[in-house]
Amino acid sequence: MAQQRRGGFKRRKKVDFIAANKIEYVDYKDTELLSRFVSERGKILPRRVPGTSAKNQRKVTTAIKRARVMALMPYVNED
């Protein structure tokens, strides 16, 4: 039989930043907002890292890709 664990810590649920701030349209020109969803190397973070919903993650990725095409955000950020 499986034993139950006692104690431990419960992981806090991540909050969707876009839904929490009631942002309906993710604008590609808002690079400050989009930089929250990009790693320091310039890669788009998977939705489990920032905790965004699937619907808002799709909005974020299309906005980031548009910003990259318009040269507002870099494709690769090398330090």
From Swiss-Prot:
InterPro entries: Ribosomal_bS18, Ribosomal_bS18_CS, Ribosomal_bS18_sf
Molecular function per GO: small ribosomal subunit rRNA binding; structural constituent of ribosome
Alphabetical keyword list: Ribonucleoprotein, Ribosomal protein, RNA-binding, rRNA-binding
Entries under SUPFAM superfamilies matching the protein: Ribosomal protein S18
PROSITE patterns listed in its UniProt record: RIBOSOMAL_S18
Gene Ontology, cellular component aspect: cytosolic small ribosomal subunit
Quaternary organization: Part of the 30S ribosomal subunit. Forms a tight heterodimer with protein bS6.
Family (UniProt): Belongs to the bacterial ribosomal protein bS18 family.
Family annotation (HAMAP family): Ribosomal_bS18
Protein name, UniProt field: Small ribosomal subunit protein bS18
Organism whose genome encodes this protein: Streptococcus pyogenes serotype M49 (strain NZ131)
Gene label: rpsR
